[in-house]
Amino acid sequence: MADGLHRVHYNPSTAQLVEFALLRGEGELTANGALVAKTGARSGRSPGDRFIVKEPSSEADIEWGPVNQAFEPGAFEGLWARVEAYLADKELFVSDLEVGADTEHYQPVRVTTQYAWHQLFARNLFIIPEEFNRKDKPVWQIINAPDFVCDPARDGTNSDAAVILNFAERKVLLAGLKYAGEMKKSMFSVQNFLLPAQGVLPMHCSANVGKDGDTTLFFGLSGTGKTTLSADPKRFLIGDDEHGWAPGGVFNIEGGCYAKCIDLSQKNEPVIWDAIRFGTVLENVVMDEHRVPNYKDSSLTENTRAAYPLEHIAQRKEDKCGAEPHAVVFLTCDVSGVLPPVSILTKEQAAYHFLSGYTAKVGSTEIGSTSAIQSTFSTCFGAPFFPRPAGVYAELLMKRIESFGSQVYLVNTGWTGGPHGVGKRFDIPTTRAIVDAIVSGELKDVETIHLDTLNLAVPVAVTGVDSNLLNPINTWGDKALYAEYAQKLAEAFTKNFAKYQVSDAIRHAGPKA
């Protein structure tokens, strides 16, 4: 469709976007029909280049700091205008989409991209509504101009690229970045700011539902198992990464999945494997000479990705919504090999571990990270995406758990028998067996043992799991060394938690240093 002096393609179809991407040299087709695109040096998020405009309507509610860096309103206006001028004579792709599957809590967003494959990504990951903006809400705007080069001296940025959120003007600007994940995480941050004011808990989690309508949530950082474990052939997928929990139910914030591809196999992850086909975007995946994706190849990045719409998954919840969850799973990847494979948490322990967000960066999604696996504390299991103070989200979680009676579990998808490099990682079948026991209700009111240093209750038996694995000390050859590592981990928890202003009941729910 012609628009002024240049071409603007409104609400283009998947086939059109794939065709444009190929014609414009943006990507290549794989043997399985997916489109491969490369992002260059920035093959992950750029947290050092993410800003929020500091303006009166939101200033008091944002936790400013290294995660939420402030940007001046005047500088934003100038940069937005420069990017618009830069795009004025370019071929562009535009879609009217929504973020949030709930009819009350959605946000309408117009996405404008310079690249066809970025538009395909947006249409895969956001929601394509039957009727756009049926409640006539003010519309958000995303502009994504990957070939625009920021000038820190002129633009007030930290580098040649920037991601800037403006809550007052409902604008998201992405400039100088090809990594498509920045688009989805920007709108996630927007909803993470807006939803608490509506009494809704936004969550960095996946969700699925059983045949009887029982919902399970899986919280966790990238690479800890959210996508893999929620893609369960026995259950229906609601979503793999971002959800809202309102009184009465949960809803997907997105319309698609952004699955990690490194070491992907048909045997271990059949649902994801089958979803990668025509219309899917593969980011930084290497192909062989026959165009067959090599999912073991991390030469471009550990953070290889597949972006596909939920419609690529046969067993999905059509409306992207579910009942309130009976089971909530916190996925932690423990590199010290100390935590048990599953623990049953009280509501105070749930708040403690939600605020702590102890886990590891596995094949990190951030640029500049090596393939080395490092332990980290990431508040709410997603610190980079939550603009408000952590206590706001923890209070909402406690409220929802209490009002519905959800049971929370801590599941370690990391190491046992020793730290990373010495012990071995729990295999996917073991973790799946634990999750099966959780969703079936098997672990409610079971006999447990108490691990004193970690202050955790561990079931003595889980169907399909070697009972020797359940108490982690059993898997260590050197029991004294295990006790030493457990004490070190408890001290790390205590030190990290000191910054939170919480009740004694929550503070005492953590490990005992």
Swiss-Prot record:
Question: How does the cofactor attach, per the note?
Answer: Binds 1 Mn(2+) ion per subunit.
Where does this protein hold ATP?
Answer: K185, H204, G220, L221, S222, G223, T224, G225, K226, T227, T228, E269, R305, T431
Q: Which UniProt keywords apply?
A: ATP-binding, Cytoplasm, Decarboxylase, Gluconeogenesis, Lyase, Manganese, Metal-binding, Nucleotide-binding
Q: Please list the GO terms describing molecular function.
A: ATP binding; metal ion binding; phosphoenolpyruvate carboxykinase (ATP) activity
Q: Where does Mn(2+) bind?
A: K185, H204, D241
One GO BP annotation of this record:
gluconeogenesis
- UniProt superkingdom: Bacteria
Task: Name where it mostly resides.
Answer: cytoplasm
The cofactors named for this UniProt entry are: Mn(2+)
Enzyme Commission number(s) of this protein: 4.1.1.49
Sites where the protein binds substrate: R45, Y179, K185, R305
Q: In which pathway does it act?
A: Carbohydrate biosynthesis; gluconeogenesis
Respond yes or no to whether keyword Nucleotide-binding is given for this record.
Answer: yes
Q: Which GO terms describe its cellular component?
A: cytosol
**UniProt cross-references to InterPro entries, sorted A to Z:** PEP_carboxykinase_ATP, PEP_carboxykinase_C, PEP_carboxykinase_N, PEPCK_ATP_CS
Q: Does the keyword Lyase apply?
A: yes
Q: Which reaction does it catalyse?
A: oxaloacetate + ATP = phosphoenolpyruvate + ADP + CO2
Q: Give the location in the cell.
A: Cytoplasm
Q: Subunit arrangement?
A: Monomer.
In which family does this protein belong, per the annotation? Answer: Belongs to the phosphoenolpyruvate carboxykinase (ATP) family.
The family database entries (PANTHER family) matched by this protein are listed as:
PHOSPHOENOLPYRUVATE CARBOXYKINASE (ATP), PHOSPHOENOLPYRUVATE CARBOXYKINASE ATP
Job description of the protein: Involved in the gluconeogenesis. Catalyzes the conversion of oxaloacetate (OAA) to phosphoenolpyruvate (PEP) through direct phosphoryl transfer between the nucleoside triphosphate and OAA.
Q: How is this protein named in the record?
A: Phosphoenolpyruvate carboxykinase (ATP)
Species annotation: Shewanella putrefaciens (strain CN-32 / ATCC BAA-453)
